[in-house]
Amino acid sequence: DMAPDFKSTTQDGAALTLADLKGQRTILYFYPKDNTSGCTLEAKSLRDGRAELARMGFRIIGVSPDSEKSHRNFCAKHDLNFTLLADTDHSVCEAYGVWAEKSMYGRKYMGVLRTTFVIDAEGRIEKVFTKVDTANHYRQILDAYK
């Protein structure tokens, strides 16, 4: 299947669309919130594995509903070396089907289902990870391509 088109903004305020990703495989990972425990573990795993993933031809882009400012702080605090999209209107999350009703402590709310999509150089969805191992996510991706 072709990856859904999107238009969003990076932590530095630059516009980014699906067309901008053509020509390189992309790990597009959706996570609920900057600076929360699971999301930080996942981001650090991808940060630590970025060089190895890049050697295999992957670029990494994270997506959450946080603001550009929140993303800049998150990147600075954890030395994140990849792009984050500020999906404040959750339109990218909705396009990829990861904006959904969740439940915590009996309270229902709308939020992001932690999911990773691998998009090939032509813009097709190659793999989807719905059971994300946050602390070892980069290994989880590498293992799927061995």
PLM features: what roles do these ranges have?
Residues 1-146:
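Chalcogenol-based redox active-site neighborhoods
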